[in-house]
Amino acid sequence: VTPSTNSGPAATAPERPAAPQRRWALDVLRIVSVIGVVAIHVFGNMVGNDAVHGSARWWGAVVVDLGFVWVVPVFVMISGALILEPRQYAKGPADFYRRRLLRLGPAFVFWPLFYVFVVSSVMAGRLADWRGFLLGVVDGRSYTHLYFLWLIVGLYVAAPVLAAFLRDGGRRRAAVFAGVVLAVTVATLVSATVLTAAGYDRSLSQSALTQWLPYVGFFLAGWALRDTVLRGWKLIGVTAVAVVGTASVIVQYGRQDHLPLLGVLFPISYYGPIVAIVALAWFVVAISVLRDWQPGRAAGVVRVLSDASFGVFLVHFAVIHLVRTVPALAPTDDDLRITVLVWVLVCVISFALVAALRRVPWVNRLV
């Protein structure tokens, strides 16, 4: 994809700004991230099964589940890398809100209703009621993964203000701002876990209107780091941080009963200290390694998969329930091979379904 140029005479028609070149590294990151999200929700069934805790198959599930713990922050960073672009606000905040929030509106309304009254009630057999649904909406967790809709809407609402502050400050201002916000977020979480462990319950929780707050730092970091390209020993060093950090999260979770102090000082959370560092590291590694990569003939496939990623995030839980209705694929809480197979099937079906739905007028607004 190359920037478009104006071919008309300069004297009679003003030159149009060049269309932004597609950032294939972000496309790849988006695809990997949503595959990781599916893994977290598929393998989490076995990770939470006390009957297999500590077994080899349980550790296998932990490696996959916790090995992808960085993908949700990276999803937010990808959004920041694209949404905080100044051209998004060329026509003012009102135009931005109209385009972005109206685009999310149908999905924002449809999917909570679908998951509560179809997936939970019909597919999972848990009878839902309007009171429980409304409480879930206020809490921002009408279904397991749908907090992300509130998260994204909150960041979109704040985006024009953040972009205005960043506009004339260059990458340095963006990096400092992102670092400060992330540091405050991490410190808030750690102080809460320390105080709670000391007997003063300060557990953190977010409602629908605050789901986005802990992720502002990642949103800013995506913009600050989107053009960061490391080479040589710097790239090797950051890659080592990403790998070692991911491994440490896996080990810490698997041995948490024996390492209680680590859980207090380094809580495993999407905005915990180690996970935050790991997410930043993987983002920079991907941007650096894939900076000049071109998919060639695979460009169409990469584009379709990337554009379908948000829809996959929305539909995959329904697909998980559907796949598990097959008796041979039901035991994802104690059979690692079946769990891997279910993961692959859910990814393939979800991407295919969303790619098809995106071609249907009106329905495409939901995915």
Protein language model annotation of sequence segments:
Residues 1-185, 330-367:
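Membrane-cytosol interface segments of multi-pass membrane proteins
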Residues 169-178, 230-240:
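Membrane-interfacial entry segments at the cytosolic side of transmembrane helices
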Residues 278-288, 314-324, 347-359:
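C-terminal transmembrane-bundle signature of multipass membrane proteins
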Residues 35-42, 113, 180-194, 241-256, ...:
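Aromatic-anchored segments of alpha-helical transmembrane domains
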Residues 72-84, 150-163, 190-231, 272-293, ...:
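Specific transmembrane alpha-helix
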Residues 190-199, 250-262, 324-330:
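Juxtamembrane "helix-exit" motif on the non-cytosolic side of transmembrane helices
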Residues 22-34, 102-105, 233-246, 289-321, ...:
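Functional transmembrane helices that form membrane-embedded active or gating regions
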Residues 231-299:
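Alpha-helical transmembrane segments and terminal signal-anchor/GPI-anchor hydrophobic tails
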